[in-house]
Amino acid sequence: AKMYKARAVFSSLTPLAPRVCGGERFASWLVRSNPTIRTSKAIAGVEPARRFASKVATEPFLNGSSSSYVEEMYNAWLQDPSSVHVSWDSFFRNSTAGAAPGFAYQAPPSLAPSYNQVPLGSLLPALGGGSQVGQVPVNEKARGHLVADLDPLGIMRTDAVHTHYAARKGAPELVLRQYMLGKIRGHHIAKLDPLGINSADLDDKHPQELLYSYYSFGKNPRTTYSQDLQYRVAALMKKETDMDRVFKLPSTTFIGGKEKSLPLREILRRLEGAYCGHIGVEFMFINSLEQCNWIRQKMETPGIMEITNDEKRLILARLTRATGFEAFLARKWSSEKRFGLEGCEILIPAMKQVIDKSTELGVESIVMGMPHRGRLNVLANVCRKPLNQIFTQFAALEAADDGSGDVKYHLGTYIERLNRVTNKNIRLAVVANPSHLEAVDPGVVFETMHLSDLPDYTTHGTIHIVANNQIGFTTDPRHSRSSPYCTDVARVVNAPIFHVNSDDPESVMHVCKIAAEWRATFHKDVVIDLVCYRRNGHNEIDEPMFTQPLMYRKIKNTPPGLDIYSKKLIDEGVVTPEEVKDVKEKYEKICEEAYTNARQETHIKYKDWLDSPWSGFFEGKDPLKVSPTGIKEDTLVHIGKKFSSPPPNAAEFVIHKGIERILKARMEMIESRQVDWALGEAMAFGSLLKEGIHVRLSGQDVERGTFSHRHHVLHHQTVDKATYRPLCYLYPDQAPYTVCNSSLSEFGVLGFELGYSMTNPNALVCWEAQFGDFNNTAQCIIDQFISSGQAKWVRQSGIVMLLPHGLEGMGPEHSSARLERFLQMSADDPDYFPPESEEFAVRQLHDINWIVVNCSTPANYFHVLRRQIALPFRKPLIIMTPKSLLRHPEARSSFDVMTEDTQFLRVIPEDGAAAKSPSNVKRVLFCSGKVYYDLKKARTERGLDDKVAITRVEQISPFPYDLVKQEAAKYPNAELIWSQEEAKNQGSWTYVQPRFSTALSHSRDIS
């Protein structure tokens, strides 16, 4: 028989079918084509077997490939109906009773609910039910005949399946299966809010399928049968005899420990304790059975949350320090903004628990990004920043260093110390961050999560602690998010989420321990939602009663977490009231001594707050001396040929024909001692790799290049994911080269690269925008971190931003990298001409906040990249990179301007006919970037080569006053013009105009 015809199995099924099959295989009979029912009456000419109207041809699970299994089930059922699953039992009973196609099969309690039933789905595997035939919902009309246990045809109705199941398994066990769903939805009814006025999920309604005490009895007219069964089961549960019955525990739970069976009452008590107490855990969305079972074991194992008395005393001591620190600041500086941690003091013991456990598991360095709330407390009690340095920030003292500094609750620090709990050394860094709360993570929250498992961006597990004070300045959470929890974004990366009540310190410590172990075990993100409150306003002088009167009335009547936990330990006999008082007084004395020392300070030292120190980098270096950037020609040739050659196993590694042409063209350029833009970049990268400098290039499409010019990764044309990276194989002992296509994010990715550049000064870290105008979606990183990071936080960074820029006649989009914005944020005085000296150029670079260049030649691009590493300090470098020049025949450089004794040219002077007779020059055009080639072409077309000089300003900021002055002096009779392709209020004009006047001592005008 044709197997596909199995789907027509019930089209001719009759009540007599199984009986008349005799010795014929039932499964074969089901799937064979057009079965004919033969009986003695049929042979005698009695009318054929009755057929049933049905919207479906057969049950969806019946097909030829399942015939052996169906036969096995059927034979077992014939021997003993109870030996098969209840769903098979009901199916065989219904089919023998003559059920029409689509009605023989009734979904068991473990399958999805039918139309109009409680949408529990996988959340309620024990009680979902109803028939769903061929994915067509059973409507109310179809249910109409299912009134009694058996309909007139003898077909078992939907509820009868459940009742039959309950009879075999026992109603209390059915309830157990239901209640075990606490591990899925128990967090909805967990007691998470320390104030007891809100639900952490913003829903005050408790899911009835979890709370058996909430079930009502009787059946409403619109109640489905599966709901009705729930009511009956709930009623059965209330019988004490059922609650004391002992049940065998399934293998999927750890609540029994060494016990294999427990009374139902104890089962429910343990499940409530594990999932519905002060901890609510979301993890069943994780698509790994191993990881889910790991969390179950950490939550369900009896006694797993018990801790020793010494551990309780440690929690008390840490909580006392956190609370005492805020109280001391409030007493000494009552009117100062400090964004205290009152209401969430448990954050300090929580972070220390994470650090302790992580250190025990082998972690040596921990980097923390956080908002301003609680930052001072973290610096004091987690990092152990000297208290006198913190208290000095409250005094209006002058700075001993250059820079603007920043408010105290934005500052970071770096500490190396011994962890006394594990007796291991640990490096702790709190990264400075403005009030853009999520920026330091980096990026907006979703971007941070999105980067977590990308190969070139993963940290192999980040522990996210949310200080969830249930309010944002004055905004209610119901107006600030659409999801139930503020942590729901973590679901997209399969990160487990632990919600915990901050007024239960021991539960918080348990969750933190699990989080550290999870990260160490699975190298994945994990989230701790610390549900707390904010005892004061947004800051200490803000009045919260204006907007949250009910909440703050409750807060005023809520004792601090320290008082609650102290009382608990006193009641347990762990500590005495005298011991609690003694711990408080000792820390108070420590604060007073630090306060006395702080009052003796006369200056603030910004360097004390450096979050990313570079050990030994600045030692033994002349701060105003730059190493040469030119290299040997042999090195240029070697790198160029390696970069321009196909993979070594070219016979096996098939590259694209277009790539072959590109490689051939590059090789021809090398033979002629020339480079284009892509070759110049590759030679800069390769030469740094040779010198042991790690190079990292990141951004959207950087492996190929937005304009298909780079091709740093070659792809096999017939083997998926087989690649070759030529710059990784230049020298056997070279530094690593990382080129990575990023996610479609600028904010998060640029922030990541900035952080990467901060960790190691001996690395060239480049971020390239797909188009220059895309940098504006990372504006926060540019404004708050890159342009001002050193002034605010004494932090240097050598990050390079590559921004494709140029008006190519393709419309306004993707044309401008907004050069004017970067120049506007350059920190130099347009009216100040620095004293000229041999170190003039380097001193300018040292004093500026960042460097902005618009190169017009591959050689200058080569040199400026190498100069980033040659400098004895680090500054961000902003490069307006070209688009049309990538393949422009004139935009090429000779090896002669890249070899030894050559360097970056801040200004490229005129070297043509005009330079030979400068007194005859009528006009000098100063310009920057690719517009030079347009001007040069127009000059030649008009025959003005000897009348018009064109000077290129390659480095716009810091402005080359000395060289501009020299160039202008060459042409005393010429009119000075600044030429740019951008509009007057864009580009460089507004920046260079006053600086030209300063360079020329206001003696000549430039227009």
Each model region followed by its residue ranges:
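Acidic, metal-coordinating catalytic cores used for nucleic-acid/nucleotide bond scission
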Residues: 505-507, 534, 773-775, 956-957, ...
